[in-house]
């Protein structure tokens, strides 16, 4: 083969090489692109699932009622249970004082019987049953369960003060004031739930919640360790204290203040956002 023929064949091979290379890249590109697409879709699904889990976890841990706090808070439950005890008496009385009072009456009766010349043994047997009946009657009258709401709240505030006091007789520390306000807030909220048209007390409740926020914010600046201990014990979290909120119908509906009653209609934007959150939570369960 001549030199001219060899050069022609070499030039033909060089000219055909890009065509083969282009054809090879054209055939392999759909496979590589499909693999990338699958990886991208899997990554997106993992991301959506993680976001849904995070949203569900945040909603379950951080959603604390800024007015009433967490449900079944031990501090509140314990005080309310204390007020229902039959042996917890109103007006500051206790069982020992009632027994002393009845013993003094019995002693005075015996002295009068001796002075009048009556048989004290017969009188004593008759008075034992009467004395027990009187004791039960006095305990029923003084029982906090049968007392006025004003006396019950006074007793609850005193119990809260003793539990949060820094020293005996402490009434001015921030945690004591916040605890006493929390007891009043719980009582006022229960009253409003039973009397929905009591707008005056609804306004007073709003003011009381704002005052508690202000006191706890001051405590956070002054003593952060004591602040977090206090809000944990009161069933609150940091967002319930630091975040601004309006105790309006939106709050009452979101936190079911009046149960499942619908107080305000959601706009289309809000309704779509809620549906989107529900779908995310459902994806997280799968």
Swiss-Prot record:
UniProt keyword terms in alphabetical order: Mitochondrion, Ribonucleoprotein, Ribosomal protein, RNA-binding, rRNA-binding, Transit peptide
Description of post-translational modifications: The precursor is processed in two steps involving mitochondrial intermediate peptidase (MIP) and mitochondrial processing peptidase (MPP).
Annotated family: Belongs to the universal ribosomal protein uS15 family.
Classification of source organism: Eukaryota, Fungi, Dikarya, Ascomycota, Saccharomycotina
Functional summary from the UniProt entry: Component of the mitochondrial ribosome (mitoribosome), a dedicated translation machinery responsible for the synthesis of mitochondrial genome-encoded proteins, including at least some of the essential transmembrane subunits of the mitochondrial respiratory chain. The mitoribosomes are attached to the mitochondrial inner membrane and translation products are cotranslationally integrated into the membrane.
Protein name according to UniProt: Small ribosomal subunit protein uS15m
Transit peptide location on this chain: 1-33
UniProt-listed GO biological process terms: mitochondrial translation
InterPro entries for this protein: Ribosomal_uS15, Ribosomal_uS15_bac-type, uS15_NS1_RNA-bd_sf
SMART domains to which the protein is assigned, alphabetical: Ribosomal_S15 (SM01387)
Keyword Methyltransferase: no
HAMAP family, per database record: Ribosomal_uS15_B (MF_01343_B)
